[in-house]
UniProtKB/Swiss-Prot annotation:
It catalyses: adenosine 5'-phosphosulfate + ATP = 3'-phosphoadenylyl sulfate + ADP + H(+). Belongs to the APS kinase family. Pathway: Sulfur metabolism; hydrogen sulfide biosynthesis; sulfite from sulfate: step 2/3. ATP binds at G17, L18, S19, G20, A21, G22, K23, T24. The keyword Nucleotide-binding applies. This is Adenylyl-sulfate kinase. Its EC number is 2.7.1.25. It holds the Pfam family APS_kinase. The keyword Membrane does not apply. Keywords: ATP-binding, Kinase, Nucleotide-binding, Phosphoprotein, Transferase. GO terms for cellular component: cytoplasm.
Length: 186
């Protein structure tokens, strides 16, 4: 079931969490639902943006902040033009996330979480194993800090909730903001 968009007002939906928590999976699934319902949607994935817009940046705190600020600039620009922007980026530092989201016309901060043992099991690239062996320096959640949101708009435990359950929570949050009306994934 889908309906016509309620508004042309844009929004930044910022998915934050550790690698493997499900940020990109959720953003892709939500984008599909919203696009099928006629909403203007763009996805900004942290890995893709880092490869193209932030090529050459490392993983120091300064470089990570620069990367997040770049993503935020693009996201906020699109949102100001009526686009629902779905950002999936680890974005480990609270202060930088808050700074970027403060500039958004409207925002929804989504904390995507799963326990470390689950993230390690999900890790098909073996990045966590390498980080735990010390082969990857500055790996968020292992040798570099991740500061979870203190008061996210939506908190999704992907180890306890299915993808459809997570989508239900996200759609309900978008409905509360009067961004969408009754978009269904069933």
């Amino acid at each position: 079931m889908s309906t016509i968009p309620t508004t042309r007002s844009g929004l930044v939906v910022w998915f934050t969490g550790l690698s493997g928590a499900g940020k990109t999976t959720l953003a892709r699934a939500l984008a599909t639902l919203l696009q099928e319902a006629g909403y203007p949607v763009e996805q900004l994935d942290g890995d893709v943006v880092r490869e193209h817009l932030s090529k050459g940046l490392g993983f120091s705190r300064e470089d990570r902040d620069t990367n997040i600020r770049r993503i935020g600039f693009v996201a906020n620009l699109l949102a100001k033009h009526g686009v629902i922007v779905l950002v999936s980026a680890i974005s480990p530092y609270r202060e930088t996330r808050a700074e970027v989201l403060a500039a958004a016309p409207r925002k929804l901060e989504v904390f995507v979480e799963a326990p470390l043992d689950v993230l390690i099991q999900r890790d098909v690239k073996g990045l966590y194993a390498k980080a735990l062996r010390g082969e990857i320096a500055q790996f968020t959640g292992i040798s570099d800090p991740y500061e979870p949101p203190l008061h996210p708009d939506v908190h999704l435990r992907t180890d306890l909730m299915s993808l459809p359950e997570c989508l239900d929570h996200l759609l309900a949050a978008l409905e509360r903001l009067d961004i969408v009306v009754k978009v269904s994934h069933q």
